[in-house]
């Protein structure tokens, strides 16, 4: 799974996910399913934000990469991917500026057009179940919830999906592609049900005699399909801005 993640996702996404896991004392090399889940969630958050701007009349517009509109304001503030201290600093700044209610938990995005925080969910389970879990945890009607699944389903607060249909379709297509690539490598079942995968693995290992030639790592080969999974949503200017904002690494 770790090899798949590093081959499938943009290096910046991988770096942010590693940083987030290490902040909580987790190892991406051991908790590989969580590593994949965090990368997927980060990518969905970035895709949710990219190409969406607010013009001088405070109207929401969509601008594809390469258009000369550098002065436009991004519609969404990305909070996910920052360390906890910086994330709360951003949240507090938004609340002080806009007057919106401060959330109890760190949200993923802030929508400057609708003036609300957004919690993004990506689930391997049924969307309604995951939505209710999110709502029960957040316990706030002020934070908007939007759930996506790997099967193309989605659910949002009051059926308000925020984005246009085409933008949401890009996210759904990407999630479906990730699922297909995992399945083709035999990784999907363990990603959906890690406990069952662990139990089955132990059972299988017990039936095997000790052998020095047993494989211990996932294949490093990249499938032809993965080579086409370039993250088109990540234009160079956006990548540079995000890297400068999120990753404050000193040059060695």
From Swiss-Prot:
The record marks 195, 198-199 as: Important for efficient shutoff activity and nuclear localization. It comes from the Viruses. Gene3D superfamilies: Influenza RNA-dependent RNA polymerase subunit PA, endonuclease domain (3.40.91.90). Belongs to the influenza viruses PA-X family. The probable endonuclease active site in the N-terminus and the basic amino acid cluster in the C-terminus are important for the shutoff activity. The C-terminus acts as a nuclear localization signal. The C-terminus is recruited to host protein complexes involved in nuclear Pol II RNA processing. It holds the Pfam family Flu_PA. This is Protein PA-X. One of its GO terms (molecular function) is RNA binding. Plays a major role in the shutoff of the host protein expression by cleaving mRNAs probably via an endonuclease activity. This host shutoff allows the virus to escape from the host antiviral response. Hijacks host RNA splicing machinery to selectively target host RNAs containing introns for destruction. This may explain the preferential degradation of RNAs that have undergone co- or post-transcriptional processing. One of its GO terms (biological process) is viral translational frameshifting. Keywords: Decay of host mRNAs by virus, Eukaryotic host gene expression shutoff by virus, Host cytoplasm, Host gene expression shutoff by virus, Host mRNA suppression by virus, Host nucleus, Host-virus interaction. The record marks 202-203, 206 as: Important for efficient shutoff activity. InterPro entries: PA/PA-X, PA/PA-X_sf. It is found in: Host cytoplasm; Host nucleus.
């Amino acid at each position: 799974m770790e090899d798949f993640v590093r081959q499938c996702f943009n290096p910046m996404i991988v770096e942010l996910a590693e940083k987030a896991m290490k902040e909580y004392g987790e190892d991406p090399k051991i908790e590989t399913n969580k590593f994949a889940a965090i990368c997927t969630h980060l990518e969905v958050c970035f895709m949710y934000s990219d190409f969406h701007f607010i013009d001088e009349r405070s109207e929401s517009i969509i601008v594809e990469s390469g258009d000369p509109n550098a002065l436009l304001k991004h519609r969404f503030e990305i909070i996910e991917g920052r360390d906890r201290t910086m994330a709360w600093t951003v949240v507090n700044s938004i609340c002080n500026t806009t007057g919106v209610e401060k959330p109890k938990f760190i949200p993923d995005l802030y929508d400057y057009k609708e003036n609300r925080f957004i919690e993004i969910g990506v689930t391997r389970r049924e969307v309604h179940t995951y939505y209710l879990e999110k709502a029960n945890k957040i316990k706030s009607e002020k934070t908007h919830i939007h759930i996506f699944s790997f099967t193309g389903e989605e659910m949002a607060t009051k059926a308000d999906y925020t984005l246009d249909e085409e933008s949401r379709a890009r996210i759904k297509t990407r999630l479906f592609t990730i699922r297909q690539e995992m399945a083709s490598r035999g990784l999907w079942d363990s990603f959906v049900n890690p406990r069952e995968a662990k139990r089955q693995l132990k059972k299988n290992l017990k039936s095997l005699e000790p052998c020095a030639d047993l494989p211990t790592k996932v294949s490093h080969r990249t499938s032809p399909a993965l080579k086409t999974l370039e993250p088109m949503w990540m234009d160079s200017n956006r990548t540079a801005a995000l890297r400068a904002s999120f990753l404050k690494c000193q040059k060695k």
